[in-house]
Amino acid sequence: MDPRLSHAHGALAGLALGDALGMPTQEMSPAQIRAVYGRITGLVDGDASQPYAPGMPAGSVTDDTEQALLVASLLIRGRGSSSGRVALNAVEFAHALLAWEDSMIERGSLDLLGPSTKAALDRVRAGEDPLTVGGEGTTNGAAMRVTPIGIA
């Protein structure tokens, strides 16, 4: 296997594993984690009290991994750009995220878009330019999706 491909697989696997390890503790303080789970030493189910992942099975990934893989698929598709460089179309990405959230809602998931991404996409839905709507966020959603960009 090409070492670059192996490294890409490793980076994405590491992202998914870290996400699955953190899934049951999203938005919980250290004290809450200790009270609900005690010491976590491996993959565990999301507790019923977990606000974003109640009852999610151990090893499940969250919106962070799903959206990173969405970025990866769009980057792969963008390799056919006329410049020969990797390209990620902002409009296509915005619409893909909207479709992703709609599918999550249909499945009954509580693990949806974060507030900054949601606010930006609501502006896209209202007809604003996707290249100008994301500058006011205060959350870390973009950092959760950046791994494929580093690989590209």
Question: Predicted regions: what is each one?
Answer:
Residues M1-A152:
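Structured, active/binding-site neighborhoods that engage oxygen-rich ligands
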